[in-house]
Amino acid sequence: MILHAQAKHGKPGLPWLVFLHGFSGDCHEWQEVGEVFADYSRLYVDLPGHGGSAAISVDGFDDVTGLLCKTLVSYNILDFWLVGYSLGGRVAMMAACQGLAGLCGVVVEGGHPGLQNAEQRTQRQRSDRQWAQRFRTEPLTAVFADWYQQPVFASLNDEQRRELVALRSNNNGATLAAMLEATSLAVQPDLRANLSARTFAFYYLCGERDSKFRALAAELAAECHVIPRAGHNAHRENPAGVIASLAQILRF
C-alpha cells in the first residue's frame, strides 16, 4: 500500500521536492508554491485520512513514515527534500529523524517538535479526543468554524476563515478524526535532541504573526525564515514570501 500523490516531473539531475500538507488539507495545498519550482520534480502527497488517501488508516507515526517511504520508492525517488506544513511538518521531522536514504534536507512550516512533559501530553490527548469526537459526529462546517477560532489561527480575518471552513468541510470527518488521534502531539516524541544531532539540512519557516511557533523555532537548531504578513498558515497567507524563502534554501 502507498499513499495517493500527484507527481509533476522536472529536469533530470535535481532532487525531488516532496510536499506534505497540514491537517485537513490535501495534495493541492502546496501546489501554488511548488509549481514555481518547475525545474524540480514535485510530489504532492495525500496523508492518511485525507484526499485520495482517505481510506488509509494508521495506528501512529511509524505507520505514516512507513507509508511515506514506500510511496517514495514506488515513484523511484532517490534524492529529495521534504517540505511540510503543520502536521506535514511533524511527519517530515519524524521521518527524517528515523533516517531516510536520499534525504537532502527538511523544510518545516509551523510544525511542532514535540511536547516536553506528561502534563502537556495529557492535556493535548484530552483536547484531541474531544475534537475527534466532534469530527466524527457533527457537521464539518460547524466543527471547522470552531477549529479556526483557536488561538493559533488568530491572524486570520473573517473572510479567510470562511474560505477555509468551506474548503476543509469537503473532508471525511471519521477519517480526519482517526488521523488526528493517531498523530496527536500527545503521542509524538519530543524531537529536539534528535534534530540537534541531525545529519540533514533543516530549515524552519513561520509567519511573523505566529508568536507560538516563532517561540518554538527559537528552541530548534535550524535556520529560521520568518515570513512577513503571515500567521500560522504562511504558505496560504503569503505564498510569495514562502516561495522566496524556499528559493533561497534551494538556491533556485
UniProtKB/Swiss-Prot annotation:
Gene3D superfamilies: alpha/beta hydrolase. Disulfide bonds: none annotated. It comes from the Bacteria. It is an enzyme of class 4 (lyase). The keyword Chloroplast does not apply. GO terms for molecular function: 2-succinyl-6-hydroxy-2,4-cyclohexadiene-1-carboxylate synthase activity. GO terms for biological process: menaquinone biosynthetic process. Monomer. This is 2-succinyl-6-hydroxy-2,4-cyclohexadiene-1-carboxylate synthase.
